[in-house]
């Protein structure tokens, strides 16, 4: 049996840093991941995936990402059972991140931190860039 997850998406908010009871660093974040297919209205739906990363990598992740950062992660799905403050049994499903990669430049991340994203559109593409690839008829190709 395999429990492997690979996702690419953007952080929905700043990563949250915690310490466990065993004094281990823990970072929680939510990754917005677009689905491959479009809905009936022609829009791509987005899933919001809870993720957690532990240890030294957690601190590196928290210090090098910000809301909107484009990242890739690899890890596993984990189901945790706990009792909340009201004494109710709760379940939490999240991705435990083993590895991550930055999928945008440091300059892009820094410009997002400073709030100066005027040079690009909301998707990180230059203004006026086509949203979809251009369709080219095979008759127009020289080969």
How does the language model describe each region?
Residues 13-15, 33-37, 55-57, 81-83, ...:
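Short, well-ordered turn and helix-capping elements at secondary-structure junctions
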Residues 5-13, 31, 67-79, 97-100:
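OB-fold and OB-like beta-barrel modules that bind single-stranded nucleic acids
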Residues 1-2, 19-22, 42-44, 103-143:
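Acidic, gly/ser/pro-rich intrinsically disordered tails
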Residues 29, 49, 95, 141:
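A broad, low-specificity signal marking well-ordered, structured residues that form hydrophobic/aromatic
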Residues 35-64:
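Glycine-rich strand-loop-strand elements at beta-sheet edges
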Residues 83, 88-107, 136, 142:
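Short terminal (N- or C-terminal) low-complexity/amphipathic segments
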Residues 4-46, 91:
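Core FKBP-type peptidyl-prolyl cis-trans isomerase
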Residues 54-90, 103-104:
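Beta-rich strand-turn-strand
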């Amino acid at each position: 049996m395999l429990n492997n997850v690979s996702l690419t998406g953007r952080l929905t908010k700043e990563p949250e840093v915690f310490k466990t009871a065993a004094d281990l660093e823990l970072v929680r974040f939510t990754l917005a991941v677009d689905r491959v297919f479009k809905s009936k209205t022609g829009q791509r739906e987005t899933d919001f995936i809870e993720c957690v990363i532990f240890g030294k990598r957690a601190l590196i992740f928290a210090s090098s990402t910000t809301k909107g950062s484009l990242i890739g992660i690899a890890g596993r799905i984990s189901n945790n059972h706990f009792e909340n403050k009201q004494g109710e049994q709760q379940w939490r499903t999240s991705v435990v991140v083993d590895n991550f990669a930055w999928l945008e430049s440091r300059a892009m991340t820094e410009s997002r931190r400073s709030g100066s994203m005027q040079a690009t559109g909301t998707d990180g593409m230059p203004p006026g860039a086509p949203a979809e690839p251009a369709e080219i008829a095979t008759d127009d190709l020289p080969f």
